[in-house]
Swiss-Prot record:
CDD domains hit by this protein: ProRS-INS, ProRS_anticodon_short, ProRS_core_prok
GO BP terms, alphabetized: prolyl-tRNA aminoacylation
Subunit structure: Homodimer.
GO cellular component: cytosol
Organism whose genome encodes this protein: Coprothermobacter proteolyticus (strain ATCC 35245 / DSM 5265 / OCM 4 / BT)
Subcellular location: Cytoplasm
Domains: entry comment: Consists of three domains: the N-terminal catalytic domain, the editing domain and the C-terminal anticodon-binding domain.
Reported function: Catalyzes the attachment of proline to tRNA(Pro) in a two-step reaction: proline is first activated by ATP to form Pro-AMP and then transferred to the acceptor end of tRNA(Pro). As ProRS can inadvertently accommodate and process non-cognate amino acids such as alanine and cysteine, to avoid such errors it has two additional distinct editing activities against alanine. One activity is designated as 'pretransfer' editing and involves the tRNA(Pro)-independent hydrolysis of activated Ala-AMP.
Record field: catalytic activity: tRNA(Pro) + L-proline + ATP = L-prolyl-tRNA(Pro) + AMP + diphosphate
Gene name in the database record: proS
Keywords: Aminoacyl-tRNA synthetase, ATP-binding, Cytoplasm, Ligase, Nucleotide-binding, Protein biosynthesis
Annotated InterPro entries: aa-tRNA-synt_IIb, aa-tRNA-synth_II, aa-tRNA-synth_II/BPL/LPL, Anticodon-bd, Anticodon-bd_dom_sf, Pro-tRNA-ligase_IIa, Pro-tRNA-synth_IIa_bac-type, Pro-tRNA-Synthase_IIa_type1
Disulphide-bridged cysteine pairs: none
Xref: SUPFAM superfamilies: Class II aaRS ABD-related (SSF52954), Class II aaRS and biotin synthetases (SSF55681), YbaK/ProRS associated domain (SSF55826)
Name of the featured protein: Proline--tRNA ligase
Length: 558
């Protein structure tokens, strides 16, 4: 391919609205162009990267027996209403009416459609298991698209679905896909973590995320470097370090004027926030709850969402109507009308301070073990430095991009959609299902987040738009054509920068775009070719007959 005929335009300055490194470089290197908020066109360079990633994904899915198909993007509301997700997705789903006033959506995911199809096509256990996948554009009306290709309203995703007659069969396929995802990420040059995760709106009994460490990541992950425990913040558990030892004071009601916040109480009593016991009042699934949690911790929203179908904080009026004083709440005698949940964050606390249910008063010296409760729960946020629940070593945290997510769904979709098969004993049973997603467009950004320097993108060999850029200097067209033919015949993608520009401009663009190998053919070098490897910066001067072998040997490390 010749640059003089290529559809691109590089930029010297970062776009003003771009925050993420990958977003800046994708725009500057003419990989993508924004069409609207969260909507991008893939230009030829970016398109080639996208298709190379798709090829890797396709090869690994085919390797484990996946069958590629294409489902419709446009779906009727009925199937979504059967699973309850027409309402659950809310404004994130792009909905519309056709000319007959029938409700439709643009698919954000395809569990409903594939389950309906399976119910129509699979009738016997003899046809199980099945694994199908597609690589397709999805649509979600994100409230705040950001970071270029990281949070989009229109994106390419590989989604796969499996159907089984037993949990054992599901586990086998789940593990096969998990390992396939590992190979995909390794082949495209990514460092990653496989972490226990929250199933979220997809649902199911078990899920894992594939997290690529990155500064602009929207996922927080906690990891123990001693035993390998790793989980996202939504499902992570920990053991809190005990606060510094303090002799327990006598149980006493203490006047604490104008101290309705945890910080105020701690400062007034000259104690750390760890010693304060919060009593958080919520309405969960239409019932009142008091959640006791250590004062230096907040409730984790994802954990609360798993505990309750719907929940919210009580208003001051609601708290008063139940006989409690806002800002000074604590357990009291005879409160049978409310369920008390005691959070695990209190396990490391021997004594503390809690509201006295009287304005401007707290009770000091409360034995935590004697607090009344109905159930012990894990609803508090985990923090860096907490102790690993498996081995007791400190946890560290890092941010990352979720690039893949796999789920054991069970019968979450097959039951409401009445997708059944006949078992070996003739019984009619719902399919046991798994689903498996990997964000193809997000992988483009993830690769750049991990592979760039001050000069631009450093593409791994496997996904580079072109493996080699040839930069001619002087009258060397015959030599360039011969090199181009030799490299192309060996299966390499070759880009010739034949623009009428100074060599320095071409060198800057070569680094920005991120070609793994740069060849400079200079009329003054008497048949020698300068080879520069983008990743290492290594530069060699070799005869033209040695270029192919030198490039292929160097490619092993790119």
């Amino acid at each position: 391919m010749r640059a003089s005929k290529f559809f691109y335009k590089t930029l010297r300055e970062d776009p003003k609205d771009a925050e993420a490194t990958s977003h800046k470089l994708l725009i500057r290197a003419s990989m993508i162009k924004q069409i609207a908020s969260g909507v991008y066109a893939f230009l030829p360079f970016g398109h080639k990267v996208l298709k190379k990633i798709e090829t890797v994904v396709r090869e690994e899915m085919d390797r484990i027996g996946g069958q590629e198909m294409t489902m419709s993007i446009m779906m009727p509301a009925e199937m979504w209403k059967k699973t309850g997700r027409w309402e659950l997705y809310g404004d994130d789903m792009i909905k519309f009416k056709d000319r007959k006033e029938q409700d439709f959506c643009l698919g954000p995911t395809h569990e409903e459609q594939i389950t309906t199809l399976a119910g129509q096509l699979i009738s016997s256990y003899k046809q199980l298991p099945q694994l199908v996948y597609q690589i397709q554009t999805k649509f979600r009306d994100e409230p705040r698209p950001r970071f270029g290709l990281i949070r989009l309203r229109e994106f390419v995703m590989k989604d796969a679905y499996s159907f089984h007659d037993s949990e054992e069969s599901l586990k086998t396929t789940y593990d096969q896909v998990l390992n396939a995802y590992k190979r995909i990420l390794e082949r495209i040059g990514l460092n990653y973590e496989v972490v226990a995760a929250d199933p979220g709106q997809i649902g199911g009994t078990l899920s894992h995320e594939f997290i690529v460490p990155a500064e602009v990541g929207e996922s927080t992950v906690f990891k123990c470097d001693s035993c390998g425990y790793v989980a996202t913040s939504e499902v992570a558990t920990s053991v809190l370090p005990a606060p510094a030892f303090l002799e327990k004071p006598a149980l006493e009601k203490v006047h604490t004027p104008d101290t309705s916040s945890i910080e105020d109480v701690a400062e007034f009593l000259q104690l750390s926030k760890e010693r304060i016991i919060k009593a958080v009042m919520v309405i969960g699934d239409s019932r009142p709850y008091m959640i006791l949690v250590r004062g230096d911790r907040e409730l984790d929203e994802s954990k609360m969402n798993r505990r309750f179908t719907q929940w919210r904080m009580m208003t001051d009026e609601e708290i008063l109507s139940m006989g409690f004083i806002p800002g000074f709440v604590g357990p009291r005698e005879g409160i049978n009308e409310i369920t008390i949940l005691k959070d695990k964050s209190l396990e490391s606390l021997d004594w503390g301070v809690i509201g006295a249910n009287e304005r401007d008063y707290h009770i000091v010296g409360v034995e935590v073990s004697e607090l009344p409760f109905h159930e012990i729960v894990d609803l508090a946020e985990v923090a860096e430095g907490d102790l690993c629940p498996q081995c007791g070593s400190p946890l560290r945290s890092f941010t990352g991009l979720e690039v893949g997510h796999i789920f054991r769904l069970g019968t979450r979709y097959s039951e409401p959609l009445e997708a059944f098969y006949h078992s070996e004993d003739g019984e009619r049973k719902p399919f046991i299902m798994g689903c498996y997603g990997i964000g193809v467009t997000r992988l483009v950004s993830a690769v750049i987040e991990q592979h760039h320097d001050d000069f631009g993108i450093v593409w791994p060999w496997s996904v580079a738009p072109y493996h080699v850029v040839i930069i001619p200097i002087g009258d060397v067209e015959a030599q360039v054509q011969e090199l181009e033919n030799t490299l192309s015949s060996a299966g390499l993608d070759v880009f010739v920068d034949d623009r009428d520009e100074r060599p320095g401009v071409k060198f800057v663009d070569a680094d920005l775009i991120g070609f793994p190998v740069r060849l400079v053919v200079n009329a003054k070098k008497e048949g020698k070719v300068e080879i520069k490897f983008r990743k290492t910066g290594e530069t060699l001067l070799v005869g033209q007959e040695d270029v192919l072998d030198t490039v292929l040997r160097g490619a092993v490390n790119l």
